[in-house]
Amino acid sequence: MLLAIDCGNTNTVFAIHDGTDFVAVWRTATEHQRTADQYYVWLQSLMQMQKIEVEITEVIISSTVPRVVFNLRVLCDRYFNCRPLVVGKPGCALPVDVRVDAGTQVGPDRLVNTVAGFTQFGGDLIVVDFGTATTFDVVDVDGAYVGGVIAPGVNLSLEALHNAAAALPHVDISMPDTVVGTNTVACMQSGVFWGYVGLVREICAQIKAERARPMRVIATGGLAPLFSQGAELFDAWVDDLTMQGLVTINSYNREA
C-alpha cells in the first residue's frame, strides 16, 4: 500500500491509500528533531489502535521543510524497505508542466495542489490553500502551473497582532456575528476574518482579470471551511486535495 506524507511548516499529514481510497489519515505537529525511529513508533501505535494491518510498499513525500525529508527517507529505507518519491526532487515526474521563471523554487505542496486540481476540475483554475501561508496557484487550461500569489496565513496574521501589540490578546479565528465588534477579541476576529475575505476575493478577481477568462476557484487547507461560510468565494472546497494529488503523482510515476 501507499503511504503519502504531506509535511508542512505547521503540521505533517500521513495517509495510507489502498489504491482506491484512504484507509487512514493522521496529523501531527511538524518537528525538525523527530527521528525515523520516532516516526515509526508513532505510526505503528496508531495502526495498532485502529487495527490496521497493511504492508507499506510505496511512499511519496511532499515537504516544505527540507530538514525533515532526511529522517523521512531514513524511515522509508529502514522500516518499509523502499525508496520514497519526493515531489520536486529528481526521480519524481509530474503529469503537468511548470511554466514559471524558477520552477525549482515552487513549493512542492503548490505543485501537488495543481496536479490534484487539474485532475478533478480541469484547467483554468485558481487553487487557494489556507496553510501557514495563504497561497493562490493558477492552473492553465492544459493543466500547467503558471504561477500564483503568496500572502501571510490567517493564523500568522493573528499571531503577528498579538506579538507586536502588547495590549492585544491571543485569539482564535472564527466567523464573527457582526462586522463591528464590541470588544477587543471580536474586533480582532472581525478584522482578520473579513480582511481575508476581502483579500481572497480581490486577489482572485485580479487574477481572472489578468488572465482575461473565467476561472473556477477551489479551496483547500485547514481554514477553508471557515471561509466557505457567509461569503461566496469558492466554487468548491476539497479537504484532502493535497493528499489526492500525491496519490495521482505516485500513480503517474509508477506507470511511467
From Swiss-Prot:
Binding residue positions for K(+): 129
GO terms of biological process kind: coenzyme A biosynthetic process
Catalytic reaction equation(s): (R)-pantothenate + ATP = (R)-4'-phosphopantothenate + ADP + H(+)
EC numbers on record: 2.7.1.33
CDD domains documented for this protein: ASKHA_NBD_PanK-III (cd24015)
Gene Ontology terms: cellular component: cytoplasm
Pfam families membership: Pan_kinase
Residues given in the record as substrate binding sites: 107-110, 184
Keywords: ATP-binding, Coenzyme A biosynthesis, Cytoplasm, Kinase, Metal-binding, Nucleotide-binding, Potassium, Transferase
Cofactor notes: A monovalent cation. Ammonium or potassium.
Binding site for ATP: 6-13, 132
Disulfide bonds: none
GO MF entry, a single one: pantothenate kinase activity
Domain of life according to the entry: Bacteria
Compartments where located: Cytoplasm
Requisite cofactors: NH4(+); K(+)
Pathway(s) the chain acts in: Cofactor biosynthesis; coenzyme A biosynthesis; CoA from (R)-pantothenate: step 1/5
Function: Catalyzes the phosphorylation of pantothenate (Pan), the first step in CoA biosynthesis.
HAMAP family registered for this protein in UniProt: Pantothen_kinase_3 (MF_01274)
Annotated PANTHER family: TYPE III PANTOTHENATE KINASE
Subunit structure: Homodimer.
Protein name: Type III pantothenate kinase
